[in-house]
């Protein structure tokens, strides 16, 4: 048997004592995948930019801002992927049970 996910699952971003951002776990999987993909595409693009910069000319403040953005987007993307994975496992278990 599988665990029932709450409809709205909080995303822990460490910026508030109580959650502010939530994932709607009942959205279409394709929409959730697109949401995660968008975040990881932005992360990839930011990392491409960082890899092409001459870091000796970059201020510590700017580098911190970019790495914080990458971290936040990656956390959100991973949270969405975790929901997708749980739903995929539930679907597979339901399929196996019906055979």
Task: List PLM regions with ranges.
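Sequence/structural signature of long amphipathic alpha-helices
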Residues: 1-99
């Amino acid at each position: 048997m599988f665990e029932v996910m709450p409809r709205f699952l909080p995303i822990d971003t460490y910026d508030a004592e109580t959650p502010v951002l939530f994932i709607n776990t009942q959205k279409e999987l394709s929409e959730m995948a697109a949401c995660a993909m968008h975040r990881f595409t932005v992360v990839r693009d930011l990392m491409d930019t960082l890899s092409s910069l001459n870091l000796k000319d970059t201020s510590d403040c700017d580098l911190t801002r970019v790495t914080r953005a990458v971290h936040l987007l990656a956390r959100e993307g991973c949270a969405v992927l975790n929901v997708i994975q749980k739903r995929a496992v539930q679907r597979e278990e339901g399929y196996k049970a019906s055979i």
